[in-house]
Design a protein with these regions (language model features):
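Secondary-structure capping and domain/repeat boundary segments
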Residues: 1-221
Length: 221
């Protein structure tokens, strides 16, 4: 459907052929000029109908196309929803208008690092056999790309000590960063006093909590 946009009147001699040049309108296809002879009663009318142009509209994020298409000028802009793990969407560059503009346009997503991305720390304790068993798991939050260090767990230092330095890493956008922290059992020396007798060994070294077999003392008389 067409609606009247503007009109203008001109004068010319009766029976002369006129061919007014159509105006150029942004976003519309310019029609070909029409010719007509001027009537003596002033009823001569030339109508120009402008069809809307179509333009290529593309939305991209991090080099990948989110959506693209060819859309009619002035119609509602089909703006897509963009998502990127570990980031907050801040809008499109350039800013998106409500309707399709009169030119081919590429819009690029603008992102900001999210500050609530999870990373995981798993704590392992050494058992009596010298193997490690998962004791607890903690979920922390950080900013995408942030360098973080695992927290130290408050175990009784009479029983356990850190095997190595606390690990560090970069918070992954997809929440995949996992720290594994190991605690060894403390080792203690155990002495045996035979009180004047003799034993096969006077000292043993053992992990906390492990079974220790005491030597049998021997004493003459």
């Amino acid at each position: 459907m067409y609606t009247a946009a503007s009109s203008k009147q001109e004068t010319a001699k009766t029976d002369t052929e006129i061919s007014p040049k159509p105006d150029i309108r942004n976003g519309f296809m310019t029609p070909a000029a029409l010719s007509q002879r001027v009537s003596a009663d002033g009823s001569t009318t030339i109508n120009y109908y402008y069809a809307r142009n179509k333009y290529n509209i593309k939305f991209v994020s991090e080099g990948s196309v989110v959506s693209e298409g060819r859309y009619t000028y002035g119609t509602l802009m089909p703006t897509p929803v963009a998502y990127r793990a570990g980031y907050v969407f801040e809008g499109w560059e350039p800013a998106v208008t409500q309707t399709v503009p009169a030119k081919d346009t590429t819009y690029t997503a603008v992102w900001k690092e999210a500050d609530d991305v999870v990373y995981t720390t798993k704590y392992y304790l050494e058992n009596e056999s010298g193997e490690y068993e998962l004791d607890k798991t903690r979920i922390n939050k950080g900013t995408t790309g942030q360098n973080v260090t695992a927290d130290k767990e408050q175990y009784d230092n009479r029983l356990y000590h850190l095997t190595d330095d606390l690990p560090s890493g970069t918070v992954a956008a997809d929440g995949s960063l996992i720290f594994r922290v190991h605690y060894d059992r403390n080792t203690y020396s155990i002495s045996f006093n035979s009180m004047g007798g003799t034993v096969s060994t006077e000292k043993k070294t053992a992990r906390w909590g492990s079974n220790v077999i005491a030597p049998v003392p021997v004493r003459a008389g």
